Structures are given as C-alpha cells and as structure tokens.
C-alpha cells in the first residue's frame, strides 16, 4: 500500500468525483486524522505498499494552521466486484462533520492508478448566462444574445466590411434583399436585411424563429442560411444566402417566355420535394408564392423567405394566426379566420402556382379579403353544410353564402392537360382534408405520365429576372403612358382654344363661359400665345391638380389656394368687357387678356362671380387697388409701352412636355422684373407707414373727442 503525504496550503477544488469514485470529506481532530505510517516531519513524503493491493494511495496535505488533508485513492478491480472507485478526502476545517460532492480533477490511467491533475476551470453561472457571455465575446450584440441565443448558438458573426453591396433585388414586408459580393470568396450572395425598431424583443424573437427554422432545414430545394452579419453596436442584421438569378414570378410574367408541360412538371416537382422536407421537419412555410420560389442559372428551384414560417405538431393542435399567406394564394379557411390548420395551407398555395404556370397569370387576384373569398367560392364552390358545422370558423356567420356556389374548376381550366387538371382539382379543394399531402401529390398521374419532368440542367437558360424587375418595368410603362396621355390632352385643348373669338369681338356670352368651365380639369387651359400681341408669357411647371378652389390671383401670374396649390392662369385673349376685373393693370385701349386670365370665376366654378363681374371687380379693388392711388397702373402702362416696341417674342416655348404658358405681368424681360419687385416692396413700406400715421391720427381724434365730451359733462 502506497501512501503519499505532503503538507502545505489546502486546495479548494482539488478533489472531484467521476462516475467511478466517491468523495467523502470528514473533519476530525489533528491527533486522530494522522495515520500511523505518516511521518511526523513536515514537507516530507514517503510511500508504502500493501501486501493485499499495491494500487491504493493516500495523500495528506496540511497548512500552517495545522490543518491536514488526507486523500485515500482506492481503485476498483472491475473483474472482482462492481463497486465504483472511492476517494476519501479528510479535511480538518472544524469539529463539525461535513459531506459534499465535488467535480474531480483526477485522471485515471490505463493501470487504474489515480494521479492528481490541475483542476479544470468550471462555469459557476447558469448555462444560459454562460452561453450569453460567450456569444457576446464572440461578437454578437447583447440584445440578440439575450433574446435569441438559441438561433446564433455555435456561430460567429460575419463583418459587414467583408461584403460589397451591389443592388437591391427584393422588397418584403419586414425586410429588404440586396445583391452583394463576398470579398473573401469573391462569390455573389443575397443579403436579407432585417432591422429592428427600438430593439423590440418580440421582433427579435420573430426574426430568431426564421433563423432557427432555416438552420433546422437542409435540402437541395430549400434555401440554405450561410451566415449572419451583425456587430455589437449594430441595430440591424443581414442573413446571408446563396444568390439566385431568378424567381418564378419574374420568369412567368416575362413576355415571350412560355413554359412547356415538362418544364412546369420540373418546377412543381422540386417545389413539392422542398415542401415535403419542410413538413417532415414540422415546419409550415405559410407564404408560398412565385416570388418566393427562387431559381439559379441551372433552373434549380429553392424555397425562400421563411419569415412567416412556423413550427407545428400534427397530433397536438396549437392556435396559429390566420393573417398569413399572400392574399392571392391564401386558402379559404384562413380567410374565414381559422387558427387550427396544418400543411394543407401550403398545398392550396401550391395549387394556385400550378394553375398560374399553365395560364400565365394569377388565377384569383383579389384586392380585399372579401373579394378574395368571393373569387374562391365562384371558382371552387362553397363548402358543404357539414363543413360549416364541424369547422366552427370564426367568420363563418359573416361570409357564409345564402346560396351555395357551384364548383367550376374543370370548366375554367379546360385547356389544361387532364393530369394537371386532376391535380389542380385536388389541391384547390375548399375543404382542407381533401387536399392530400405532398407525398400524394408527387405520386399523382401528373408526374408519372408522359411527358415526364425535365431535368433542370436541360431547361433553357434565361437572363436574370425577378418580380421586382417586372414591377419596375410596369411602373415605367405606366408613367410613359400617363405622360403621353397628358401631352395628347394638352394638344387637344390647344386645338379647341383656336375657336376663341377674335380680339375685336364685343363680348362673349355667359353661356359660352359656363361651357368652358368643364375644362378646368385639363392639364392646360391656355392657348399658344401670339408673340405679336401685347402681353408676356412665362414657362411654368404644370399643375399637379387641375382643380383650384378658393384661389385669388394677383399680378396676373398665380396665387396659392387654401390647400397650398398653385393656381395658374390662362394666356388666351378675350373681349374688352371682361377686363373690368383688371382696371388696376391696363387702360381700356390695351389689348385684352384671356377670359381665364386673372379670373378666378372660371377656375373655381363660381357662377356668382361670372354673373356679377362687378362684384369681383369691387372686391379686388377693395383689397388690392388702394395702394398709392393707382401708382401700379401708371407704372405698368409705361412698361407696357416699352414692351410693345419689341417685335420678337419673349415667349419661352421650350419643350412641350409637361409645360404650359400662362399670362404674366405686362413688363418687359430683363432687370425690369427686379425693379417691379423693388417698387412692390416700396409700396408695402409706404402702406405700413401710412397705417401707422392713420392709427396715430385716430388716437388723437379719439382723445380730442373724449376731452370734448368730458368738458360738456357727457
């Protein structure tokens, strides 16, 4: 029997137990703790062997406080008995007897001899806190590690400066997708940016669920999450995916691209295989649509965007939200408010995709939930009475039709191949249980009859095409169409304005003016101005709205109505009578302006102003004609005489698109406009001074009146 005895400082964590040892600590008095063979001198050790077992060892340690620790190592002969290895640690701490279990630092060799090693560092905090600390040290932000530690466990974040962002290729409800280049591998990737408002824990958990689901899935037809980009100080996160050149919606809507039956079978087969993998892992995608089905240059299809995905358990029903799946691909049970559903919601969306690939357009494009449900009932029929009773859907009483709808899927898609039509009939069943599973769909005649599904690599190669590209082109085409429409309307108005009476006409009837009121919604109500006539013209941006209400014009250009819109005036000429509304500008011998020029009556639709032009004239003079006794009229007439000497037109025609000509002040071009503004400012100052003088005069008169009344005793 060997005995090792050493004296010194007592360690705290020396003795740990493993599965083959028992640790017992007993505190006894010094004179009882020392074995007989232990030497009396300090810092000295010797070994002894037992005739019965040479593999038993003692170890004793003591410190300056005369406390000793004796360790007895007793290995087990596995052939003779089944007892576990025991280790007794005797420590002198006090007279109290203490038993405890500790982790061990003993490493058992091949010969079953226990040798004491340096104790390993152990975590003294909880597992979650320890993992959180390790994740923060690895570079993850604390707000993410504290809420979504499971999602990032075992990963190290990538740095944003290791990627080069190229362009935006997608926009979703909760995120944006960018095309980027990985500078470390020089490969193209897709970065899905998720930003959190105020680090809301719920939104972080929502994003973490997507990451956990993506890490659980591993299939060739499912997008693989390759990494995450974030930092300790970042408020957003990027999910790194493989870059895919196309999505199914972009290709299907491209003019000139028609899918063959074998090609459609190839895409649908890959889609169903990917869904089968998701459903076998207990995952519902809940947003199957063309833009989420991505294709690479070899026509390999992968399901993407698991932002709305969730876990489900088939045998344990759990309430789920019904506000999922894009409206055009949403099944009727979700529109009716069901919270107890399963894989059949993805199968309904798959049926919509199948029919869309054959027809080339969405089959049920509803704008609202009510309209979408109505389209479903018209195409697929309404559920049976038994289904209404058994399902107990929340919105059943609201949306249940009084008369049942007849199913007409076969009549609507009669041009489809019979095998495809049969599969569409199954997948678009109104009652969820009749839709089958992904496995049953893959075993249907659609995939087993000729022509068989093509190999993805044998399909045609296309230019990169995504749904966002299609939308951008549609918006551009719509903008061009609107622009051309505006130009055509402007030309039509210009042709109509040539029928306006000549300047020597005596008057224009009230009926004619009222007829013209209906044109106030046109882009322009002005004629092309004749450069030989006595008026100026400015190039002005077109009206955003053709209707101007409550607008008052000053100085013949424009004014701002109560809604903040500029009200532009016309530039065609009209008879002399209508110029009674503009006496402060020109004298009667001057050429007349348009019946629309400086007149709000025809713009705001005020019949009172048209029938009573004197009322408008008096109103205008009361508001604007009091400044300095008509000095404005005299100055503008002088400028007008100077302007008539010029034979060349100062009309700026420019490009016709989105431009219009409106009458302006009767002044010549150049610096005279600045002089007019200065004169305007001077008149304002004079008016303010006059008002002050009048106010002081009125105060003096009031004081004299009061003094007079007081003197008379009144």
UniProtKB/Swiss-Prot annotation:
List, in alphabetical order, the Gene Ontology terms for molecular function in this entry.
ATP binding; protein serine/threonine kinase activity
Covalently lipidated residues, kind N-myristoyl glycine: 2
Domain Protein kinase positions: 163-447
Q: Which UniProt keywords apply?
A: ATP-binding, Kinase, Lipoprotein, Myristate, Nucleotide-binding, Serine/threonine-protein kinase, Transferase
EC numbers, comma separated: 2.7.11.-
Q: Which Pfam families match?
A: Pkinase
Q: Specify residue ranges for compositional bias: Low complexity.
A: 16-27
User: Matching PROSITE patterns, A to Z?
Assistant: PROTEIN_KINASE_ATP (PS00107), PROTEIN_KINASE_DOM (PS50011), PROTEIN_KINASE_ST (PS00108)
Q: Where is the composition biased (Basic and acidic residues)?
A: 471-498
Q: Where is this region: Disordered?
A: 1-64, 471-579, 693-714
Residues bound to ATP are: 169-177, 192
Biased composition annotated in UniProt, kind: Basic residues: 31-46
Comp. bias intervals (Polar residues): 506-528, 556-573
Give the family per the record: Belongs to the protein kinase superfamily. Ser/Thr protein kinase family.
Q: Which PANTHER family match?
A: CELL DIVISION PROTEIN KINASE (PTHR24056), OS11G0242500 PROTEIN (PTHR24056:SF397)
Name listed for the protein in its UniProt record: Probable serine/threonine-protein kinase At1g09600
Query: Which organism encodes this protein?
Result: Arabidopsis thaliana
């Amino acid at each position: 029997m060997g005995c090792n005895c050493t004296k010194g400082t007592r360690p705290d964590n020396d003795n740990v137990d493993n599965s083959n040892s028992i640790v017992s600590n007993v505190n006894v008095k010094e004179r009882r703790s020392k074995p007989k063979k232990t030497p009396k001198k300090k810092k000295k050790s010797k070994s002894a062997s037992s005739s019965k077992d040479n593999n038993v060892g003692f170890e004793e340690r003591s410190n300056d406080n005369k406390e000793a620790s004796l360790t007895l190592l007793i290995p087990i002969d596995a052939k003779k008995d089944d007892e576990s290895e025991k280790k007794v640690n005797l420590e002198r701490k006090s007279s109290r007897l203490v038993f405890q279990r500790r982790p061990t630092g003993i490493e058992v060799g091949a010969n079953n001899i226990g040798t004491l090693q340096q104790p390993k560092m152990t975590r003294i905090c909880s597992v979650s806190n320890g993992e959180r600390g390790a994740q923060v040290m690895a570079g993850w932000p604390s707000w993410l590690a504290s809420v979504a530690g499971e999602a990032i466990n075992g990963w190290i974040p990538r740095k944003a400066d290791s990627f080069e962002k190229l362009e935006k290729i997608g926009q979703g409800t909760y995120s944006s997708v960018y095309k980027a280049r990985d500078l470390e591998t020089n490969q193209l990737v897709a970065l899905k940016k998720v930003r959190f408002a105020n680090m809301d824990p719920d939104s972080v958990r929502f994003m973490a669920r997507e990451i956990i689901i993506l890490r659980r899935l591993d299939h060739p037809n499912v997008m693989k999450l390759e990494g995450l980009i974030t930092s300790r100080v970042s408020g957003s996160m990027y999910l790194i995916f493989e870059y895919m050149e196309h999505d199914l919606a972009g290709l299907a809507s491209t003019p000139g691209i028609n899918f063959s039956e074998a090609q459609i079978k190839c895409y649908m087969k890959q889609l169903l295989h990917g869904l089968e993998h998701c459903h076998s892992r207990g995952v519902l995608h809940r947003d199957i649509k063309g833009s989420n089905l991505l294709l690479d240059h070899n026509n390999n299809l992968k399901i993407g965007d698991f932002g709305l995905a969730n876990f489900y358990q088939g045998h344990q029903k759990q309430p789920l939200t019904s506000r999922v799946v894009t409206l055009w691909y949403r099944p009727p049970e979700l529109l009716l408010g069901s919270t107890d559903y399963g894989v059949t919601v993805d199968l309904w969306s798959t049926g919509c995709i199948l029919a869309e690939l054959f027809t080339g357009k969405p089959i049920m494009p509803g704008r609202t939930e009510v309209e979408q449900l109505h389209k479903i009932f018209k195409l697929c029929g309404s559920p049976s009475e038994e289904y209404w009773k058994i399902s107990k859907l929340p919105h059943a009483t609201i949306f249940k039709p009084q008369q049942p709808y007849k199913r007409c899927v076969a009549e609507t898609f009669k041009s489809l191949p019979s095998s495809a039509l049969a599969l569409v009939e199954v997948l678009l069943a109104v009652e969820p249980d009749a839709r089958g599973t992904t496995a049953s769909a893959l075993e249907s005649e659609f995939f087993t009859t000729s022509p068989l599904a093509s190999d993805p690599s044998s399909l045609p190669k296309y230019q990169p095409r995504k749904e966002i590209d299609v939308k951008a082109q549609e918006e551009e085409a719509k903008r061009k169409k609107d622009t051309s429409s505006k130009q055509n309307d402007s030309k039509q108005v210009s042709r109509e304005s040539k029928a306006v009476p000549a300047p020597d006409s005596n008057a224009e009837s009230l009926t004619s003016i009222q007829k013209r009121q209906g044109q106030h919604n046109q882009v322009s109500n002005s004629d092309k101005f004749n450069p030989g006539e006595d008026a100026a013209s400015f190039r002005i941006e077109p009206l955003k709205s053709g209707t101007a209400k409550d607008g008052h014009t000053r100085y013949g250009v424009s004014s701002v109505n109560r809604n903040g819109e500029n009200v532009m005036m016309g530039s065609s000429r009209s008879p002399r009578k209508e110029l009674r509304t503009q006496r402060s500008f020109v004298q009667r011998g001057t050429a007349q302006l348009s019946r629309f020029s400086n007149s709000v009556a025809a713009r705001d639709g005020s019949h009172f102003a048209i029938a009573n032009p004197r009322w408008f004239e008096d109103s205008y003079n009361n508001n604007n004609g009091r400044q300095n006794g008509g000095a404005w009229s005299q100055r503008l007439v002088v400028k007008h005489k100077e302007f008539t000497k010029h034979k060349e037109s100062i009309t700026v025609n420019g490009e016709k698109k989105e431009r219009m000509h409106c009458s302006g002040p009767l002044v010549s071009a150049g610096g005279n406009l600045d002089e007019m503004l200065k004169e305007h400012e001077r008149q304002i100052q004079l008016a303010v001074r006059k008002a002050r003088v009048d106010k002081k005069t009125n105060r003096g008169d009031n004081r004299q009146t009061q003094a007079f009344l007081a003197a008379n005793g009144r």
